[in-house]
Amino acid sequence: MSNKGQLLQDPFLNALRKEHVPVSIYLVNGIKLQGNIESFDQYVVLLRNTVTQMVYKHAISTVVPARAVNFRVDDSAEG
């Protein structure tokens, strides 16, 4: 994934992680996972509920926070 693709993704996921916002993650096959984002990198998200699951980003369709989240995007980095 290009750096440009990370401009929205990283600040959004980081805000969810820092604020301990519960999320529902829908996979491309329709499965719904719920928990808190513990960590993430370019390829995976660690989702914590009763256990920690490693979810590959290419399998994720949608991330739905349980509440609104404020996050900043660095506009100067856009091309």
UniProtKB/Swiss-Prot annotation:
Family, similarity comment: Belongs to the Hfq family.
GO cellular component annotations of the record: cytosol
Single annotated GO MF: RNA binding
Record text on subunit structure and interactions: Homohexamer.
Function: RNA chaperone that binds small regulatory RNA (sRNAs) and mRNAs to facilitate mRNA translational regulation in response to envelope stress, environmental stress and changes in metabolite concentrations. Also binds with high specificity to tRNAs.
Keyword terms: RNA-binding, Stress response
Protein name: RNA-binding protein Hfq
Domain of life where this protein originates: Bacteria
Gene3D superfamilies assigned to the protein according to its UniProt record, in alphabetical order: 2.30.30.100
NCBIfam families xrefs: Hfq (TIGR02383), PRK00395.1 (NF001602)
SUPFAM superfamilies xref list: Sm-like ribonucleoproteins
GO biological process, one term: regulation of translation, ncRNA-mediated
Membrane spanning residue stretches: none
Sm domain sequence ranges: 10-69
